[in-house]
Amino acid sequence: MPRKHDETDNEYRTRVIDPISDSFCAAKWLNATIWLGHGGTASCHHPPAHNIDKEEIKTNPSAIHNTRHKKKMRQMMLEGTRPKECEYCWKIEDMEKDSDGHRPVSDRTFKTVIYSDEEIERIATMDPADDVNLKTLEIAFDRTCNFACSYCNPAFSSTWVKDVRKFGGYQNIKSDARGHFIDDAPYADPFVKDEENPYVKAFWEWWPELSLELEELRITGGEPMMNDSVWGLFEWFKDNADIHPNAKNMRFAVNSNLGGKPKLITRLAEASQHVNKFHLYSSGEAVGLGGEYIRDGLIWSEWKQNCVIMLREGNIEGFHMMMTVNALCLDSIVQFLDWMLGMKREFGASKPRFSVNILRFPSFQSALTLPDHLRQLYHTELREWLNGVRARDEKDQHGQPLVAMWEEEQLTRLIEYLDVVKTPHRNTADKDLLEHDFRVFYEQYDQRRGLDFRKAFPRLVEWYDSLEFTELAEPENDIQKPKGERLVEVFAHREVSEDGEVTVEEVRQRTRKTGESKDDYDDTKYADEPDYKKSGSSIGWDPESDGLGGQ
């Protein structure tokens, strides 16, 4: 069992994790997110993604997970050294106490406790340079998506790509987030339609071995329902249900924004009937107009109905809500929690379960950009909501608490975070610069999307209007130009300095096959030409140069 009966997360950490080291996290061995579309990987959603070696996977397909970088991080964790890329957890743990006065529980505990004690002992005693098969895997086939959420970017959303291609890169952003919004992230889509993708090829080569031990396969995106490969996986489960030794034991999960048309939602519900253990993940953190503003593309009333349709008509073992806590969602986060409570009362405590994920990048959208009086207001509202839940102590029809202990612990962590932590991450710009970027970003966001910040967040208007920003005398020239104002063969090229500063210059590309790297050139004339569609960090952060990945 992952944890003993009635064992708290802190008790588990003391019993299992601490004896290994002060920085151990099983996710570095047993969990991965892999962006097959362009060849990026990470062991959880907090560190920046890093590149998969395209040459190494030719002889070792498991290197789409077992990269040299991860093996280095594993060695550090076994030695008790804190990898800098895992700073999210170190910030939580260094708070010393949560809002209940307990030792804070970071995500490395949550991401370790899901595995058996035997698995933990096995990886903790193996050579960190050895390859290991995953237990939980999240993959994305491409970035096709019908949403363009404010905290997302073109690397993950084709709708974001359309925004930047139509209007050009976002102007006048000065902090660490600039690299997210200055171009259409061409590296995230490096292969033409009929070109073989070596990362997808490696995945399928590893699959016969991997599928025997894998406990959960989770598909993310983009929006998975818009990719044919996802429906192919549903067919795999249907065809192998009775012949594959692990098909009925493996959880198959899909991360969906559930913003599809009714026909697509019905197709998903029908496809789930052929999966023995199907789990559905969706995202949300705010209600109504605010939720629609943050998650552009969302229609709040339709999304709620789609959640209900999936729970009533789908074969759903687990329904999970991923909350990305940002500066804007706190204005209605309590109402969103109330909506989830209502769902739990109707469908059971686990439908949905929720996770509270604190946004750090882009840092100007972090909750820590807010002024002290708003942070204190939201801190109080969340504390009162949680106190009410504890006082009522509601159970579902099976006697399970509507809000699980670990859900409460994540909320107490957020409550304390709003009170104690001052910067989203160690390379964050100063507060004035974050406020500047907050204002200039959302002014452009409104103009491009036909939205209205002031209507969506009336309690933030006074502060928002007080934010000072420097207007540009003329448009910046080092970012991607709007459609119609640039030559087809001219694109933005991103460079990241050792300090994490992003600079971009436009470069002229020769006509060549999409995805061709400069190592493949056969013409010395172009030997020094920047590589256009180059695989890179999935979110525009280079773990070797931004100070977050390694020593």
Which residues does each predicted region cover?
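N-terminal pre-triad scaffold of radical SAM enzymes
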Residues: 30-43, 127-155, 214-218
